[in-house]
Regions:
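Sequence context surrounding c-type heme c attachment/ligation sites in exported
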Residues: 23-28, 32, 51, 56, ...
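Sequence contexts marking disulfide-bonded cysteines in secreted/extracellular proteins
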Residues: 21-23, 67-69, 86-88, 167-170
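Amphipathic alpha-helical interaction segments
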Residues: 13, 65, 74, 148-151
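Sec-dependent bacterial lipoprotein signal peptides
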Residues: 1-20
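Compositionally biased, intrinsically disordered/low-complexity regions enriched for serine, proline
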Residues: 9, 44-45, 189
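N-terminal secretory signal peptides
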Residues: 46-99
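Ser/Thr-rich, Pro/Gly/Ala-heavy low-complexity intrinsically disordered linkers and tails
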Residues: 18-45
Length: 194
């Protein structure tokens, strides 16, 4: 079973049955440094890079104007994210019917919840494609935090913690039926909302 920062702090009993598709023996839960320094504040369609900047950007709620799933739900296998709601920016929404790599700027926010009846997210997972070539996940930025535990993941796809907690699973998005829980899933993105 995959042990990760989400499973440690958000309802691990529900997580047990949902992680078989994305296994990793690395149980790291530490945070990498503030990736990229966080100097870019982002904009309404692009999250910034760096934990402090992403935290402030999420608090602004600007992503709630994106293409969001209508309700909180149990995560789709093989996700380890327990209970969530995904919001995709226009880059993903406008290219969801495609089959090639996502354009630069593709981004999503996954609100993480402790239960399907919770009304406030207990954490967030954010990803952003930073270059045209995904380079096996190296050119994707990932951020993950839990309200109770602070930032757990913050860095590019080759960062050791990011690789064990995010990239190792997201690499399989769209690769086969088990890793395509939503139409259009591919190139690091499992659930393109449009």
């Amino acid at each position: 079973m995959r042990t990760n920062w989400i499973g440690t702090l958000l309802a691990p009993s529900i997580l047990v049955g949902m992680t078989a598709g994305c296994s990793s023996n690395n149980a790291s839960s530490g945070s990498s440094s503030d990736a990229g320094g966080g100097s870019d504040a982002g904009n309404s369609q692009t999250p910034p890079i760096g934990a402090s900047a992403v935290t402030a950007w999420l608090a602004s709620g600007v992503y709630k104007g994106w293409h969001c799933e209508s309700a909180v739900h149990m995560a789709r296998p093989p996700s380890p994210h327990n209970v969530d709601r995904v919001c995709s920016n226009d880059v993903i929404a406008n290219n969801a019917a495609g089959s090639g790599p996502w354009p630069v700027g593709a981004a999503a926010v996954k609100e993480l919840y402790a239960s399907t009846t919770a009304t406030t997210p207990g954490g967030y997972a954010v990803y952003l494609k930073t270059q045209a070539d995904s380079a096996n996940g190296a050119n994707w930025y990932y951020y993950g935090s839990l309200t109770a535990g602070g930032t757990a993941v913050d860095g590019m796809g080759t960062d050791a913690t990011v690789m064990s907690q995010c990239t190792s699973c997201h690499l399989a998005a769209g690769s086969d039926a088990a890793h395509t829980p939503s139409p259009g899933g591919r190139d690091e993105v499992y659930t393109p909302v449009h």
